[in-house]
């Protein structure tokens, strides 16, 4: 089941560059590697992800580094801060492929500028787990999901505005 908004997005962006084309755009900077080591430990390494080269015309697969995807997200963030042209990056990957690193590492970079990262997740248990893991790394994170009261949500949002929250997890209905 695909939501019509997702279908519309895919149709609108069908001529966007595919992940397999990122290889030519950016190289992984040492500062990005340093962030990986800081938050994932001194033995951490970027893994390779298998992606379709061009899913519109076939199922040929190539491998791309998590680091290159992270670097691309960081560069797109920098482009947006300078009001330069940006592009979307769309990724689907199975459980265990390393998707959390793909948005968390750029978010650590973004947080150095005082900006916040908003993550939309339909799974409350996953959100709670992600928040707990981030807090264990010394990163301020909160989650807002169904079943929370208005006052509790207002307090959490105030913490985003006036506190030092770096990650805000939201369930789609919020």
Model-derived segments and spans:
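N-terminal helicase ATP-binding lobe
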Residues: 1-174
